[in-house]
């Protein structure tokens, strides 16, 4: 009778052999003993079934008795060797630290235990073997009560133990995931990906072999009657006989067909599952490439297959891409003779011709000098070209702003009139502070510093930079270096445009989002007084409040300020509402045209200075210069 599974079964059995033997070398190098034993047992079982299916595909003659003696031992050993290998895999995953001891234990489980199992089968083996048509050699195990604990129980028991180990390993991996991952990364032979693939392989094998073992037990109990085990002599009477069973007989019993087919198809199925987990991994692809290189060199094949000719013409010197490459190379070659000095001088000359629109920038309202009861709308704003105190505010692009604050840009030391560090002195810096007064809005006081060369950083408010004809309004807690001397070089004329700057002892860096520097045109000799100063503290900088950072104040205080400014502008300030002006100091400029410094009689004391300090810290980006 022809085998309905022929030639499908021999093909899959051969594929199982290949799938198990191909990954074996690199698993041997990494000393994965459980995986190696699983591959060996599966490959041997597939080889056994492959040979049997080829030899006895259409008959049941005893043509290879010696092979049958070996074949039945392989079948018995593989029935427990494969589950035992799976047990070794999950046990190794549970305790992966002790490698040498694990290899020895795996060898005992996967080699010694199957050998003992094969020896014990002699107790329930009634004769030498059976030859089943289409299947081949098969063990002749009698169906007695002693057969179940000696033969059928072990695959199921090993599967249960493997399930317990795999559960414990998964719990341990989930509980100590971080430490486990670090340990796996330190292990050169076991990665997280391989760990998970091994666990998946072991669990898949358990889900296949354990239920199948239970099913085989049930089938054997129902397919043939269970005979009592009498004695050794009765069981082994006529031990030398060989039963030859045609396919038409054993295929007539569906339970026997299911039992035999499950037994022989299990090995190729496990081989394919193993290859599915490990045959497409990164190390497998790397070894495939190495093997192909060896075969290619042995056969003499070229390293790469020559590509077919295309209709596209190769690039020539007349192509657009080639011309672009030549132009780019010529320009790159010209960079070697690039003169930075000529470039910056040319840029400087062009920067002087750069202009802005007059009404593009908006100035904040000028701070009042004396309080007043009248005010103006909070929506009013002062722009370039408008007038304050009867004087028109010129555009920052006019020549009146002839002394801009020198600012330094990294990598652009010679750009326009941005002077280099050598052109700036390094005077000691002081904090400008004032006595607290009843009309100080948000603890802010305006000071008048008559010095055309003042260079300062302002953590809050606005500073005004101009020549000696105009005022510089310096908010409270601003860092103001000493005035320039006659020996200092004059800064080149450049329109004073809004810039962001941060201070240091030499004012040598430019940083964004710090301060705004804009011009002012108010008379510097008006309302000046003594200016108390003290050295910069060594403590950390302070952070501004939201109102100081964004220039926001309450509507009531804003209207009071507007009223005070209106009274000052119209000259109608009430003497009864005038508070004593805070102490201030006028720093005389180097120019002889400036008014002499005047001071008020208000005392300058530590208490007054501390009382005038704001409740919120200054900006953390303010770098105060130390002496």
From Swiss-Prot:
It is a multi-pass membrane protein. Residues 519-533, 545-555 have a biased composition (Polar residues). One of its GO terms (biological process) is pheromone-dependent signal transduction involved in conjugation with cellular fusion. Residues 372-387, 569-607 have a biased composition (Low complexity). The chain crosses the membrane at residues 8-28, 36-56, 70-90, 103-123, 151-171, 198-218, 261-281. Induction: Induced within 6 to 12 hours after mates contact. Residues 363-405, 479-505, 518-627 are annotated as: Disordered. GO terms for cellular component: plasma membrane. Residues 1-7, 57-69, 124-150, 219-260 are extracellular. GO terms for molecular function: mating-type alpha-factor pheromone receptor activity. Belongs to the G-protein coupled receptor 4 family. Receptor for the BAP2 pheromone, a prenylated mating factor. The receptor/pheromone interaction may have a role in the fusion of clamp cells. This is Pheromone B alpha 2 receptor. The lineage of its organism: Eukaryota, Fungi, Dikarya, Basidiomycota, Agaricomycotina.
């Amino acid at each position: 009778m022809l085998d309905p599974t022929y030639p499908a079964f021999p093909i899959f059995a051969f594929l199982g052999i290949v799938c198990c033997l191909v990954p074996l070398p690199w698993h041997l190098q990494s000393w994965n003993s459980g995986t190696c034993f699983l591959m060996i047992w599966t490959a041997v079982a597939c080889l056994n079934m492959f040979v049997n299916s080829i030899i006895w595909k259409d008959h049941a003659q005893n043509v290879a008795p010696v092979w049958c003696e070996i074949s039945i031992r392989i079948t018995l050993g593989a029935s427990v060797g494969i589950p035992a290998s799976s047990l070794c895999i999950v046990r190794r995953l549970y305790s992966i630290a002790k490698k040498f001891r694990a290899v020895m234990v795996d060898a005992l489980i996967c080699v010694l235990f199957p050998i003992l199992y094969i020896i014990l089968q002699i107790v329930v083996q009634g004769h030498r073997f059976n030859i089943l048509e289409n299947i081949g050699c098969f063990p002749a195990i009698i169906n007695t009560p002693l057969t179940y604990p000696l033969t059928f129980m072990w695959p199921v028991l090993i599967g249960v133990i493997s399930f317990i180990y795999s559960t414990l390993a998964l719990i341990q991996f989930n509980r100590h995931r971080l430490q486990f991952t670090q340990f796996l990364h330190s292990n050169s032979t076991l990665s997280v990906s391989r760990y998970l693939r091994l666990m998946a392989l072991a669990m898949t094998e358990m889900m296949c072999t354990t239920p199948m073992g239970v099913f085989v037990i049930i089938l054997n109990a129902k397919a043939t009657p269970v005979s009592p085990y009498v004695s050794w002599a009765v069981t082994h009477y006529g031990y030398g006989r060989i039963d030859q069973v045609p396919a038409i007989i054993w295929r007539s019993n569906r339970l026997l067909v299911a039992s035999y087919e499950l037994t022989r198809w299990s090995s190729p199925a496990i081989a394919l599952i193993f290859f599915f987990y490990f045959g497409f991994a990164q190390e497998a692809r790397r070894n495939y490439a190495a093997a192909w290189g060896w075969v290619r060199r042995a056969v003499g094949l070229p390293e790469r297959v020559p590509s077919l000719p295309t209709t596209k013409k190769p690039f020539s010197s007349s192509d657009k891409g080639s011309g672009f490459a030549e132009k780019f190379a010529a320009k790159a070659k010209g960079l070697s003779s690039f003169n930075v000095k000529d470039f910056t001088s040319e840029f400087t000359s062009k920067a002087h011709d750069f202009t802005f629109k007059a009404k593009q920038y908006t100035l904040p309202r000028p701070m009042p000098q004396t309080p007043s009861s009248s005010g103006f709308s909070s929506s009013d704003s002062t722009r370039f070209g408008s007038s304050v105190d009867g004087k028109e505010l010129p555009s920052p692009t006019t020549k009146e702003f002839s002394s801009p604050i020198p600012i330094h840009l990294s990598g652009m030391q010679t750009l326009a009139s941005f002077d280099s560090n050598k052109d700036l002195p390094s005077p000691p810096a002081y904090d400008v502070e004032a006595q607290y007064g009843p009309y100080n809005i948000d603890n802010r006081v305006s000071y008048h510093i008559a010095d055309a060369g003042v260079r300062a950083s302002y953590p809050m408010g606005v500073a005004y930079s101009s020549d000696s004809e105009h005022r510089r309004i310096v908010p409270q807690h601003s860092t103001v270096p000493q005035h320039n001397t006659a020996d200092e070089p004059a800064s080149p004329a450049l329109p004073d445009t809004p810039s962001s700057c941060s201070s240091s002892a030499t004012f040598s860096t430019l940083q964004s989002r710090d301060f705004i520097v804009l011009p002012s045109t108010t008379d510097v000799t008006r309302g000046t007084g003594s200016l108390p100063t003290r050295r910069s503290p060594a403590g950390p900088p302070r952070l501004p409040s939201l109102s100081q950072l964004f220039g926001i104040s309450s509507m009531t205080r804003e209207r009071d300020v507007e009223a005070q400014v209106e009274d000052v502008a119209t000259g109608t300030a009430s003497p009864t509402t005038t508070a004593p002006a805070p102490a201030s100091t006028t720093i005389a400029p180097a120019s002889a045209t400036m008014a002499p410094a005047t001071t008020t009689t208000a005392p300058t004391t530590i208490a007054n200075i501390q009382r005038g300090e704001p409740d919120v810290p200054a900006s953390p980006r303010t770098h105060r210069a130390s002496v």
